[in-house]
Amino acid sequence: MQWVRDQVETYERTGGREAGTLRDTGIPVIIVSMRGAKSGTVRKIALMRVEHDGDYALVASKGGAPDNPDWYYNLVAHPTEVTVQDGPEPFFVRVRLVDGAEYDEWWQRSVAVFTPYAQYKEKTSRRIPLFVATRSTTADAEGAAAKRAR
């Protein structure tokens, strides 16, 4: 979608000073960059900013659609080749799918930030995947890239 590409470009260019909210909602977003599962090309998206103790929730809601967003498969394929930008500079993260009580806690945090998630959950028969992104080191991402190149 062009508006997503425009938002990502503006956010990155201004270090988050502009385009830091979801359209006209005033709700903050983060920029998530990842490697494409099939293409290997870097993909970027803006997601709702759900942060707790330095970790971030990445909610694969796709507006309650019956299928997962494409970026879900990118994160599953390359969980250590991900960056988050929450302000002027991006940083490396590792992502992991959560379940059980941890899922419930992060889901509650996510709905508190963006209440439409609750409607999305009611709208779909799938369990909306939820990743937690935790800060990582450059070495983690470089090691993953080196393994892939072999």
Protein language model regions, located:
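Short coil/turn segments at secondary-structure boundaries
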Residues: 22-26, 121-125
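Generic C-terminal helix-cap and adjacent flexible tail
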Residues: 136-150
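Short beta-strand segments
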Residues: 26-61
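Short, structured beta-strand-loop surface elements
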Residues: 62-117, 123-127, 135-137
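Short hydrophobic/aromatic beta-strand or adjacent loop that forms the aromatic wall/cage
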Residues: 29, 127-130
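Extreme N-terminal tail/first-helix region
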Residues: 1-25, 146, 150
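Short, well-ordered beta-strand micro-motif
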Residues: 33, 132-134
